[in-house]
Structures are given as C-alpha cells and as structure tokens.
Amino acid sequence: MTRIPHFGVASFMVCVASFSALTSWATEMGVLAETVLLDPTVQRPSARDLGISPGILRTGQYNAITDVAGVAVGHMTLSKGTRVNTGATAILPHGGNLYRDRVPAGFHQGNGYGKFTGSTQVIELGELETPIILTNTLSVPQGMEAAISWTLKQPGNEDVRSVNAVVGETNDGFLNDIRGRHLRAEDIEKAIVSAKSGPVQQGSVGAGRGTISFGWKGGIGTSSRLLPEELGGFTLGVLVQTNYGGILRVDGAPVGTALDQYFMREVIDKGDADGSIIVIIATDAPLSDRNLKRLASRAMLAIGRTGSPVTNGSGDYIIAFSTHDSVRRGLDKTPSNGLANSQMSPLFQAAVESTEEAILNALFKADTLRGHKGTVEAIDIDAVREILAKDP
C-alpha cells in the first residue's frame, strides 16, 4: 500500500488544487507556448524551433530571464584566433542601485567542485548587493574587481567600504588559453555596463564562449515561464552557463547514446562527464530568501533530466532572486515575508521547466568552435530531429 508522507492534509490539498489549476489553465491555452520564430541573423535553432517545449507552462515574450521586469543581461565576448575564446556575462536584478536596494536571494550547491565567490554572505544574509558575474575559472578575481569597481562608482555609494561581489565560473581551458588570463576587469565591466532587457543572445557568447556540454559545444542559454493568473500571474526566468556532461537526454529521448557520445562510453570509454553548470533564477514573485533557496534547489531536477549524474568534478551552483518591491531590503526598509510555503509548488514547476529548456537552448544555439587545444563540434541538429521523431 502506497503511503502519502504525513505533512498535513491541508497542505496536501493546497498542492493538489494548485497543480489542478495549473494543468487546466495549460490545457485551455493549448498546453504549450507559441513557437518562437528564428532570429533571421542566427542560423542555429532554439529548442522550441525544434518543437521541444518542456512542461506545460507558457513562456514570456522573449522566453528569457529578461521576461522578469527590470532584469538585464550583458555579454562581453573575447575571441582572438583559436587561442583565446572566453568572456563574461552579467545579470542585473534591476536598474537601480543594487547595493542600496538589495534583492533577496537563495543559494543552492549541488556538487561543490568550483568557485562561487560571495556565496557565503548570500547564504548568511539572503540578499544580493551587486550584479551576478559569470566567467571562466581563472578570471574570477577580475570578475570580482569589475563588480566592486562598478558598485563603488554608483551614485550614493561614496562611503561604501565593503562589497560582496558574486561571481560564478566554469572552466573553458580546452577551447581557451585559460592560463593566459586574457580577461581584464575593465573587459568584464563592459558586460555590466552593456546589460539590457529584451532578447538575450545565446550559445557561444559571453561566459559561454569556450564552454563544452555533453561533449558538444555548450554556452549560454535562457528560458522563462508565466504562471496563470489563478496562481499569481508571476514570471520566472532562468539563465545558464553550461560546461558539464553526462548522457544527454533531450525531452526524454536518449540523444547521447543514439549519437554515440556519452560519459563512460569506452570503459564502456574515456568520456568525461566532469564540468560545471551555473544556473541563475529570477522571479517577480514576492519570495523570502528561505523560499528562494528552496526554489534554487529545484533546478537540480532539470540538470538530472538532461542526463547529468552530477559527478565528482562537477561544480553545480544555483542562485535565485526575487525582484518584487515588497521583499527588497534597504538600509531603512523592512521587507515582507512573501508568499506562503503552500504557494511555492507552481514556481517549483516553472523553475524545472525553464532550467531544462535553457540548458537545451545553450546546446542548440552554440556553434562549432576551433579553439586552443582542438575543435568542439556543435550538436547535429538534423540528427537530433531524427532521434526525436523515432522517440516521440
């Protein structure tokens, strides 16, 4: 006999009602969002261009983290011949003074083989006070310098003497001469200054310029979801930097094994599933830092759905923040507690769906790249189409 864990009948009924409303709404809306048209300047398709739309929720206008009002993204890509292929990506929660108008944040660590500066203060205080910077492993100090310099220059911060720079990284050392440390702080600051709302460039750009995913070219990916009005009408968006491996699954189909490229292939192989993924989650739902931490943890489900076993050498880090004015923190502002625990499940669903699609977009949008130690091919889109047609 299957037993339901004892967490309270009332809580259980709220969860059932929430998902019932969510499913009914998705059915009425045709279940899936409209197909996003290809950007005429970009030849590589997104997941939705291939008919892949994880989950049941609609996307926002841009199907990007910038569908959350106020969130801005900037890229700085550094490419010099085959030797230098790296960059930085900046995510700004809003366009004001981030230090004086702080957003609540939650942090989750999967496997901790990596460097995510500023994370301990985020865990302790539950807030962000700088842009989030993504870059390569050996450019983390330059990322910190960029975030600190930019913050100190903001009007109103003349007396600031401590800045918690938040910088995540993945190692792009195969396609990029990472030991050369070619990125300067002023280069990375350009990503902050250039950040804007609207469509977000994906694939081999910014911090994703030199990354590898499941043996193919990885990069930056993004996606978003809208909750129905009955469940708050909130928006949730995700941006990922993918540089990890495993046995790739696309919408449940075993693409990695079908294309004969996967972890442990020659031992069953010398395949390498190690690497890292950084996930940034933004939402306009009013959430406490505690519930943002819970939200961040759900991204690990999407990482697993794409085929990652979360290996020994993987650095899997997720940070989630809320832009809602009622939960922001200031020097003279007391935030509200935000949504109740019982209202979180639809947002958990949105986080899993958006993260999975963002990962696939990073993979599909990335181009073949000849780099420092060799060439990494982009995944064969036609082959993926054939596999999906055989495994509906």
Where are these regions (language model features)?
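N-terminal secretory signal peptides that target proteins for export/translocation
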Residues: 1-5
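Residue-level detector of intrinsically disordered/flexible regions characterized by low predicted structural confidence
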Residues: 6-9, 30
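Bacterial N-terminal signal peptides
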Residues: 10-24
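Alpha/propeptide regions of enzymes that mature by internal proteolysis
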Residues: 28-392
